[in-house]
Swiss-Prot record:
GO molecular function: structural constituent of ribosome
Ribosomal protein among keywords: yes
PROSITE patterns tied to this protein: RIBOSOMAL_S28E (PS00961)
Lineage: Eukaryota, Fungi, Dikarya, Ascomycota, Saccharomycotina
Superkingdom, taxonomy of origin: Eukaryota
InterPro entries: NA-bd_OB-fold (IPR012340), Ribosomal_eS28 (IPR000289), Ribosomal_eS28_CS (IPR028626)
Keyword vocabulary terms for this entry: Ribonucleoprotein, Ribosomal protein
Protein name: Small ribosomal subunit protein eS28
GO biological process: maturation of SSU-rRNA; ribosomal small subunit assembly; translation
Length: 67
């Protein structure tokens, strides 16, 4: 990772469910640490639980909701 790449820190506030063909992706709602009034839904690969801090390379894209 380049040291000049801007990143955004986000805290997992709720785990919404598993998705992906084999359940390897978790859909979570995150709250940005620099702007706590803003929350988005993201897909996360790998183990994740509430109160984890994620480093987002891109913070504008939001995941589609599970059905």
């Amino acid at each position: 990772m380049d040291s000049k790449t801007p990143v955004t820190l986000a805290k997992v506030i709720k785990v919404l469910g598993r998705t992906g063909s084999r359940g390897g992706v978790t859909q979570v709602r995150v709250e940005f640490l620099d702007d706590t009034s803003r929350t988005i839904v993201r897909n996360v690969k790998g183990p994740v639980r509430e109160n984890d801090i994620l480093v987002l390379m891109e913070s504008e894209r939001e995941a589609r909701r599970l059905r």
